[in-house]
Amino acid sequence: MKALRAVSLANTAVMLLAVLWGAWVTSSDSGDGCGASWPLCKGTFMPDWDYAAIVEFGHRVVSALAGLLSVAVLVWVARVRPSETRLKRLAFGTFFFVVLQGGLGAAAVLRPQPDLVMALHFGFSLLCFTFALLVTVALGQGERAAFQRPDVSAQPVAPGLRTQIWGLAVYTYLVVYLGAYVRHLGASMACTGWPLCNGELIPPLYGPVGANFAHRLGAALAVVLVLRLWWTARRLTERDDLRRGAAWALALMAAQVASGALFPLGYLNLLTQLLHTGLITGFWGVLSYLCYLTLPVGRETVAVSA
C-alpha cells in the first residue's frame, strides 16, 4: 500500500509541475513552439529545437507522464481497493481531467481557440492537480497522516461551515478562470499601479482594463471570504485539521495577493508569473483538501458548529 501512495504522490508532484510548466508556456508565448503539429513537434520527433519548441514540447512530455501515472494509479486502486468507492472516483476524476486537458491542449495546437476557451485550459489543469492530490490524501488517511489527530475525522462538520467552504471553492475557481482569461487576453498590465487601476478608483469597465479590474475585485472579495472562513475555523478546537487548513489558506491568499500586486508595480516577468501560478495552485490545493474534510466519514456523532 505504501508503494501505491508513493506513485500517487509522484503523480501529484508531476501534476504540479505540469501546471507550472503550462504557465511557463503561456507566459513565454510558446504555445506555437511546435507549430500546428500534435503530438509531434513541427511534424517530427526531432525538430530544430529553439526556445519556444523546447518549452512547448517539454510541457507535452510532462503532461504525458502525468497521464501515464494517472492510469497507473487508477488501475492500481481498482485492483487493491475495489470496495472504496470514493477513492476510485477520485482516481477516475484524475484520469478524466487529464484526458480532457490533453484534448483541449491538442485542439489549441491544431486550431486556434478564443481566449475564453484557452482560459479553461488552466482551470482543468487545477482540477487534474486537485484529484491527484486528494487521491494521495485519501490513501494517507488509512495511515493516519501526521498532521491529523487519530480521532479528528470522527467529528463531522456542520452544514453551515460545509456550505461556506464549498461556496468559497466554487467562487475561487471562477476568479481563477477570470485571471487565466486576463493572462490569455494579454491584459496583465492593463491596470498600472496598485491598488488603484491607472490612477482611478473605478476605471472603464470594458475591454482589457475592465477584465483586469474585474479580476482585482474578484480577488478582493475572495480575501474577505477566506478571512471569514479562518475566523470561523479558528474556534473549532475539535478539528485541528480544519483550523490549520484555514490558516494555510489565509497565508497563501495573502501571498497570492502580494504576488499579483507585483505585476502592475512593474515586476511582470516569468519568475513572478510562475510565483503567482504556484501560490494559487497551493491555495487551491488547500481549499480542495478542506472540501474533502467536510465529506462525511462513517457515522456522525457530535456536529462541529460553524
UniProtKB/Swiss-Prot annotation:
Q: Where does heme o bind?
A: H59, H121
Keyword tags: Cell membrane, Disulfide bond, Heme biosynthesis, Iron, Membrane, Metal-binding, Oxidoreductase, Transmembrane, Transmembrane helix
Q: What is its main location?
A: membrane
Pfam annotation, one family: COX15-CtaA
User: Can you tell me which residues bind heme b?
Assistant: H215, H276
What this protein needs as a cofactor is: heme b
Give each disulfide bond as a residue pair: C34-C41, C191-C197
Q: Which residues lie on this side of the membrane: Extracellular?
A: 27-56, 111-116, 186-206, 269-277
One GO cellular component, as annotated: plasma membrane
Record-level Gene Ontology MF annotations: metal ion binding; oxidoreductase activity, acting on NAD(P)H, heme protein as acceptor
Query: Any idea of its EC number?
Result: 1.17.99.9
Q: Which residues lie on this side of the membrane: Cytoplasmic?
A: 1-5, 78-89, 138-164, 228-247, 299-306
Give the membrane topology: Multi-pass membrane protein
**Which residue positions are annotated as catalytic?**
E56
Where would you find this protein in the cell? Cell membrane
Give GO BP annotations, semicolon-separated.
heme A biosynthetic process
Spell out the subunit comment: Interacts with CtaB.
Its biological purpose is as follows:
Catalyzes the conversion of heme O to heme A by two successive hydroxylations of the methyl group at C8. The first hydroxylation forms heme I, the second hydroxylation results in an unstable dihydroxymethyl group, which spontaneously dehydrates, resulting in the formyl group of heme A.
Q: What is known of its domains?
A: The N-half (TM1-TM4) and C-half (TM5-TM8) domains are connected by an intracellular loop. Each domain is formed from four-helix bundles and they align in a pseudo twofold symmetry manner. The N-half domain is the substrate-heme O binding domain and the C-half domain is the cofactor heme B binding domain.
Which family would the database say this protein is a member of? Belongs to the COX15/CtaA family. Type 1 subfamily.
The protein's name: Heme A synthase
Q: Which organism is it from?
A: Symbiobacterium thermophilum (strain DSM 24528 / JCM 14929 / IAM 14863 / T)
Q: What is the lineage of its organism?
A: Bacteria, Bacillati, Bacillota, Clostridia, Eubacteriales
